[in-house]
Amino acid sequence: MAGEIPDLIAEARTGTGKGAARQARREGNVPGIVYGGGIDPLAINIPFNVLLKRLKDGRFLSTLFNMKVEGQDDVRVICRNVQRDVVKDLPTHVDFMRLKRTSKIALFIPVEVIGEEECPGLKKGGVLTMVRPEVELRVTAGDIPEQITIDLTGLEIGDTVTISSVELPAGAKATIDRDFVIANLTAPSGLVSAESEEDEDAPAADEVPATEVSEE
């Protein structure tokens, strides 16, 4: 489960629009905006290297931050969008939404897999296919889970893991009502091909196999 909320330090940006944003980038910052919470949006700058490191650390879009801006009250935020340069794939603008610790928000949470060593299907050569490596959950902003876990113990080839078989963290709920598939165990391609060839060689249901008839 989520632990201590990390700080994210930014500075208020004077001026808005494309000109101010370009100036921020020239000075080694990434321009951004903080909105929501029933108060006016706040234009900010975040040091490029700080933001890039956070992005490389992973889970940036599902991490609740305590944003510190000089002259402003600390506020809990979550990133809702990171715009990137289409060529260099580097961040050029970032949007944050203000949240209360008790706010509910929909986030994609990574799926962790355990129990591979106790999975008969994998031991027989089965292949695990992750249909949903991440699952969208509605969670409390102050208690965002790091991942949800699926257990392969005892599963055979042909079995599936659905959301109903997963123990979700307290307060979390899937955003999709139906019992969707997260992963499945399929037969290895070689075995599937062999079975297909056997099916082709077998007589059709409405055919009678030819038999030798002895003449009397």
UniProtKB/Swiss-Prot annotation:
Signal peptide: none annotated. The keyword Transmembrane does not apply. Part of the 50S ribosomal subunit; part of the 5S rRNA/L5/L18/L25 subcomplex. Contacts the 5S rRNA. Binds to the 5S rRNA independently of L5 and L18. It comes from the Bacteria. This is one of the proteins that binds to the 5S RNA in the ribosome where it forms part of the central protuberance. GO terms for molecular function: 5S rRNA binding; structural constituent of ribosome. GO terms for cellular component: cytosolic large ribosomal subunit. Residues 191-216 are annotated as: Disordered. This is Large ribosomal subunit protein bL25. Keywords: Ribonucleoprotein, Ribosomal protein, RNA-binding, rRNA-binding. The keyword Ribonucleoprotein applies. Belongs to the bacterial ribosomal protein bL25 family. CTC subfamily. InterPro entries: Rbsml_bL25/Gln-tRNA_synth_N, Ribosomal_bL25/Gln-tRNA_synth, Ribosomal_bL25_b-dom, Ribosomal_bL25_C, Ribosomal_bL25_long, Ribosomal_L25_dom, Ribosomal_uL5_bac-type. One of its GO terms (biological process) is translation. Residues 195-204 have a biased composition (Acidic residues). Gene3D superfamilies: Ribosomal protein L25, beta domain, Ribosomal Protein L25, Chain P.
